[in-house]
Amino acid sequence: MASASDARSLVELRLLDGPNLYLPRPAAKVTLDLGELLGLDVAAARDLGVELGLGNTRPGAAGSVFRQRFAVRLVTQIVRRLASAGGATRLAVRTRTGQAVNVLVVAYPWRNAGRAEGLAYGLARVLDTVTAGPQAVAEMIIAEGAALATAPLGSAPELIRPQIPVVAITGTNGKTTTARMIGHVARQAGRLVGWSSTDGVYIDGQLVEAGDFSGPSGAGRVLRHPGVELAVTETARGGILRRGVGVAYNDVSVVTNISADHLGLGGIDTLDQLAEVKAVITKITKPGGWCVLNADDPRTLAMRLGTKARIWVFTRDPNSPGGRTVLSGGGRMTTLLGGWVCVLAPGADPLQVVEVIDVPMTLAGLSRVNVENALAVTSATLALGFSVEQVADGLRSFDPNENNPGRMNIWTLPVPSGTISVVIDLAHNEAGLEALLEIMGGIRPPHGRLLLGVGTAGDRGDEVFVRLGEIAAVGADVVEIVHKGDYLRGRSMAEISELITEGAAHAGMAIQRAHDSELAGLVSLVDQARDGDVVAIMTHQDREELDRWLLDHQATRDDAGVLRTKVLRAGATS
């Protein structure tokens, strides 16, 4: 074979080590530029199709979407001919068109890196010859196929086949909280638990490696650690797209929800495409395992149709249409009945697990999103075989401030006029901000105001920042912008401020202040706060610094009793 550098049509090659968007096993993802093929005149394209076995096809006009469809068939044929020449018969080939008409993604399974790469470069070089005519293309296929047959095999995929139970968790919001709660329930029940997330790798509750390990490397670190009895793996969209899922299968998969986040990145432009990525973990759940799905999220609920596992849904509404559908099909549902977390199954009485008000993470039932997280955790841990008593004990003892740093952490802070509440939360998108505002309102006494520091990482679309500004202005009394300097990701602070300010203006608010750091924003808002106010910061990079500042200023973390008192006081007077 010639060198890889002369393959003009090849845009990108990725060897995905695990199940992925394209196949439930390791796959090569090849991104191609079909510009030359799309630019052929109709007669030349038709002759090429005939030469490659497509018959008397109609290739469509140059550059048209009809030519694109013709190109997809032609490329698939070329891949199979090259693979056959290299010794691989009946190769599974998947294709996806890009937003631009000339972009095509081709995926096929791989076992040996050398052969997989050789096939990708060979395919690109064949496409580079299309302007030379059908005979030149046919000769190039023969030459590249012969070279592929003798290419070095290379390394195998780094795919783990777990020997212990694995829970895989994904979704737009709630992944880390759900993973932490599942791990806590299991640890309280005496299991040695390893879990990986966006915060790092934890073994038996201890951080052993900090960083974002929501991809396959995190799962690998957990499963290779000696003595671990249960692996809890947070599985993010980016890891699935870049390397695939790190394990061949799981025992329980959990999908919390699907909402707009990171759209426009990695070829994922719509919610339906995002849901397709998240669904990968459900497709590798063992047939005897359980898929735990949000019954009230239509994209999540639809994942039940693509898995061989049993279905267990969760919903706050016992009359949820999605829940009824699953129950009628023999599945299970975790829901709320009479203030209790209950499990429903066909032909059985409701199984009472725990009262919602006794689950600190739900903030006395105030936090709808964390009620849903608790329902998901109940489903997953019961599916793993833990007893009702073990699950209830774990839910009751999971303290949001101690066990879930950075997520709905609530403090009481003295100020000259009395005390205020401070909420630190890793809200990073519209749904997260709405949940944060719900919590703020739920602990505010009648005379209190809501003061909010809003901001998120720069890798969101313009519309996300505008929408954050709108939501903040509608929900809070005072709004200031808090930037995340380490997470601008190509944007300037001025650009982000302009977009958020634009959104706030839609709701009739003029934002006056923007801060270079989260801490500066917290200090500014606290300086304006008076007795009974609630201050909140959307944090991303300075959580530990915020915690230190609060402790230095005599703030105390709210325990379950204090939280309940705040909620009841706000509810009794609202």
Give names to the regions the model predicted.
Residues V247-I258, L274-A279, I311-D317, L499-E502, ...:
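A short, gly/pro- and small-residue-rich
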Residues I169, S196, E234, T256, ...:
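Residue-level signal for inorganic ion chemistry
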Residues M1-V101, V105-A113, I141, L382-S387, ...:
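ATP-dependent carboxylate-amine ligase
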Residues G154-G200, L207:
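Walker A (P-loop) phosphate-binding motif
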Residues Y108-I164:
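Extreme N-terminal, non-catalytic leader segments
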Residues I268-A275, A279, G289, K308-L433:
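Adenine nucleotide phosphate-binding catalytic loops in nucleotide-utilizing enzymes
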Residues F213-T307, V313, P318-G322, D358:
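Flexible active-site lid/hinge loop adjacent to a nucleotide/diphosphate
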Residues D199-S214, G218-A219:
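P-loop NTPase switch/communication element
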